[in-house]
Regions:
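Ordered alpha/beta subdomains of enzyme catalytic regions
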Residues: 2-239, 253, 340-459
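Glycine-rich phosphate/ribose-binding loops and adjacent secondary-structure elements
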Residues: 220-376
Length: 459
């Protein structure tokens, strides 16, 4: 008998893909409302999700993960198994049985949601997602929303830096084997694709998301045969013009020479080790001297935006970059400071105050201003009821009402197209690889006054 358990998150248990304190708080809210005859209509909370600060050397961020967040809000339910699990927790022994018998079995998220468009660029302290609804509903979604949005926004922002450096190269995401879980590998492929990558090695991302899966061969495929050329022959026999030969198993230049047997009838050759700049120049000469001018050179091997910039600056003839570990883990700074904070309860603005952290209170809106050339100029954070500044773009738009989708989610290709068009509006200074410290979020006078008055009230 197989008693193993995968531990995978699925449609039947994803409601519990959260921190336990979300559920203890939620149950306490329920008990309080029950004892005080408070209905959910009179227990309305508003939260905003935003990033506190840039990861290292970032000057902008890319919003990604919205579709997975919305899927959760539409589909997550408490099942008999999850309810039984919670009921048996000793910590809940003082919670009224109706919580488990009536409330959870019939639970469905009843939330209003506003959001930036997925693929948009944004900056710290700007709400990218706003959630409003009964306190229990709005509270317990925090962990899941942060998980999918933090990670995908982190990877999309990293991929965007790489795309900025190599806008005319083919970019492939190769990081699944080094990502932090199978699901993280899929999400990394998705986030990279949003930020302009052309494909991924991840096959599930192809099956489920339509991101073209691509790959070459491993060194083991070459090593299986006594003669390197035999491995090329077999691969070519099966895959023909789609063949990409890995030529660095033994000797890169000799491998390149052997690949010339097939002329321009193969797609490319890949180099995965050594001095990529030197190897690429020598391989290109070998290919060209043997009439293989159309054969492309693919490079991998712990690539990142800095290494790719050096390769391009030194005119190495590499056509395709496969970027793995550095991208799928955002290795230079693998975290993003995303938070989800209560900013209003039953119409009353709320604020979080500490020595280092202040959360702007009240329901807010982000307005984007462009210059006369259509380039990004500044963002203004204001209270949502304030009139929009003239000639501004309002970034937070309604997407869910009363728990139902009211704005159709775009297809992944359309998200990528929006990103590619929109990122052109961001001045080049923001796209530098080093931190430039030029962004300053403009705060409206009414929001600043509200913030100051609440700080005075609570300190």
């Amino acid at each position: 008998m197989n008693d193993m358990n995968s531990g995978f998150v699925n449609d039947l248990n994803m409601i519990l893909a959260t921190d336990f304190y979300q559920l203890t708080m939620g149950a306490a809210y329920y008990q309080y409302n029950l004892e005080n005859n408070i209905t959910e209509e009179n227990d309305i909370a508003t939260f905003e999700l935003f990033i506190r600060k840039f990861p290292e050397n970032r000057n902008y961020l890319i919003f990604a993960g919205l579709e997975q967040a919305i899927q959760y809000l539409l589909n997550a339910r408490f099942t008999e198994r999850t309810i039984k699990f919670l009921r048996e927790k000793e910590v809940f022994k003082k919670i009224d049985p109706s919580f488990f018998d009536e409330y959870l079995p019939n639970f469905k998220f009843n939330l209003d949601v506003w959001t930036m468009r997925e693929g948009n660029f944004f900056f710290p302290n700007e709400p990218i997602l706003r959630v409003q609804g009964p306190m229990f509903h709005a509270q317990i979604v925090e962990t899941y929303l942060l998980n999918v949005i933090n990670f995908q926004s982190l990877i999309a922002s990293k991929a965007s830096r790489i795309k900025n450096i190599a806008p005319n190269k083919v970019l492939l995401e190769f990081g699944t084997r080094r990502s932090h879980s199978p699901l993280a590998g899929v999400y990394a492929a998705r986030a990279s694709y949003i930020a302009g990558f052309n494909g991924s090695s991840n096959v599930v991302a192809d099956l489920e998301l339509g991101i073209n899966s691509s790959g070459t061969m491993a060194h083991s495929f070459v090593q299986k045969f006594d003669d390197e050329l035999d491995s090329f022959d077999l691969y070519y026999k099966i895959y023909g013009k789609n063949s990409i030969f890995l030529i660095d198993t033994y000797d890169t230049e000799k491998g390149a020479q052997k690949s010339c047997k097939y002329g321009n009838t193969i797609w490319g050759v890949r180099i995965d080790s050594g001095d990529l700049i030197d190897h690429a120049k020598k391989v290109r000469k070998i290919l060209d001297d043997n009439g293989c001018e159309k054969v492309l050179i693919v490079a991998s091997s712990d690539l990142n935006e800095y290494k790719i910039k050096e390769i391009i600056d030194k005119n190495a003839p590499i056509d395709v970059f496969g970027v793995g570990t550095e991208l799928a883990t955002s290795r230079d700074d693998p975290t993003i400071a995303g938070v989800y904070k209560l900013i209003e309860y039953n119409g009353e603005p709320k604020i979080k105050i500490s020595e280092e952290k202040v959360t702007y209170p009240g329901i807010k809106q982000v307005h984007r201003i462009y210059d006369r050339n259509g380039m990004f100029k500044e963002d203004i954070l204001s209270l949502a009821y304030e009139p929009a500044p003239s000639n501004s773009e309002t970034l937070l738009i309604p997407i869910m009402k009363d728990g139902e989708l009211i704005t159709k989610l775009p297809k992944l290709d359309d998200i990528q197209k929006f990103y590619l068009d929109n990122i052109k509006k961001l001045p080049k200074t923001y796209k530098k690889l080093e931190e430039v410290d030029i962004f300053e979020l403009k705060i409206s006078e009414k929001l600043r006054h509200l913030t100051d008055s609440l700080k005075l009230k609570y300190t």
